[in-house]
Amino acid sequence: MVGQMKSFLFLFVFLVLTKTVISARKPSKSQPKPCKNFVLYYHDIMFGVDDVQNATSAAVTNPPGLGNFKFGKLVIFDDPMTIDKNFQSEPVARAQGFYFYDMKNDYNAWFAYTLVFNSTQHKGTLNIMGADLMMVQSRDLSVVGGTGDFFMSRGIVTFETDTFEGAKYFRVKMDIKLYECY
């Protein structure tokens, strides 16, 4: 009988300790799924190059000459956003804001802008800001708010440079994932 009690006690303690160790492990967090997800293309034509009439952005300050990476240059833009890569497609929104080059030893810009939607599909705005590490293939900026169809939205915009034609034109694929939708 004493042998059975010892075996039972040992088994009981073993099970309690095993349960404690298992429950002490942190559960793995699964990635939340976006409540809205869509892709847009950002088209930028710089002022002062070949296509002045169709320019959608202009430098309002020039770099002061501190390096070879445009450090200090400030650009204001009002760029069309399309659902495909074609610049001639009907814009579904306008990206209105600015970016400035903020790194002396590599290309890097800091963006702050509003996507202004006025289409049959969406009405309202999304506010986006953050660092664009241009030399990285895929980079994320923050969606920090919105209005209308995007009231108080938050999320991530993943940038991928799709086309780059020097100081003339560039196109960025923007994968917009909203995680807070009201």
Swiss-Prot record:
Question: Where are glycans found on this sequence?
Answer: 54, 118
Question: Can you state the subunit structure given in the record?
Answer: Homodimer.
Functional note = Dirigent proteins impart stereoselectivity on the phenoxy radical-coupling reaction, yielding optically active lignans from two molecules of coniferyl alcohol in the biosynthesis of lignans, flavonolignans, and alkaloids and thus plays a central role in plant secondary metabolism. Enantiocomplementary dirigent protein that mediates the laccase-catalyzed enantioselective oxidative phenol coupling of (E)-coniferyl alcohol to (-)-pinoresinol.
Q: Which cysteines are joined by disulfide bonds?
A: 35-181
Q: Taxonomy-wise, where does this protein's organism fall, top ranks first?
A: Eukaryota, Viridiplantae, Streptophyta, Embryophyta, Tracheophyta
**Location in or out of the cell:** Secreted, Extracellular space, Apoplast
One GO cellular component term noted in the UniProt record for this chain: apoplast
Protein name in the entry: Dirigent protein 5
Q: What's one GO MF term for it?
A: guiding stereospecific synthesis activity
Give the family, as the similarity comment puts it.
Belongs to the plant dirigent protein family.
Renumbered to this chain, the signal peptide range is 1-23
Name its species: Arabidopsis thaliana (Mouse-ear cress)
User: What tissues contain this protein?
Assistant: Confined to shoot meristem, vascular region of cotyledons and siliques abscission zone.
Keywords recorded for this protein, A-Z: Apoplast, Disulfide bond, Glycoprotein, Secreted, Signal
Tell me the Gene Ontology biological-process terms attached to this UniProt entry.
(-)-pinoresinol biosynthetic process
| KW Secreted (keyword) present | yes
Where are the annotated coiled coils located? none
Top-level lineage group: Eukaryota
